[in-house]
UniProtKB/Swiss-Prot annotation:
Function summary: One of the primary rRNA binding proteins, it binds directly to 16S rRNA where it helps nucleate assembly of the platform of the 30S subunit by binding and bridging several RNA helices of the 16S rRNA. Forms an intersubunit bridge (bridge B4) with the 23S rRNA of the 50S subunit in the ribosome.
HAMAP family named among the record's database cross-references: Ribosomal_uS15_B
GO cellular-component term (any): cytosolic small ribosomal subunit
UniProt keyword terms in alphabetical order: Ribonucleoprotein, Ribosomal protein, RNA-binding, rRNA-binding
Subunit and interaction comment: Part of the 30S ribosomal subunit. Forms a bridge to the 50S subunit in the 70S ribosome, contacting the 23S rRNA.
A molecular function GO annotation: structural constituent of ribosome
Name used for this protein in its record: Small ribosomal subunit protein uS15
SMART domains linked: Ribosomal_S15
CDD domains xrefs: Ribosomal_S15p_S13e
Amino acid sequence: MAISQERKDEIIKEYRVHETDTGSPEVQIAVLTAEINALNEHLRTHKKDHHSRRGLLKMVGRRRHLLNYLRKKDIQRYRELIKSLGIRR
């Protein structure tokens, strides 16, 4: 279900704004997207895992809030991010 630390580090390196960046909206959204995708795969095989489904919904909501924030703050960075992540919005 959870993504490995190595995969998380790869995502951070790919989406960071500067060398020590771990908390920018782009990084947070990219990590959440990877976790959401992993949890979706888990829920495809374990359809009755309602506890994980609730966690998935919370992650989707958190990602939505971060995307809204980024869209208000910098529309160009927002568009580049959703294009690179393949998020339908």
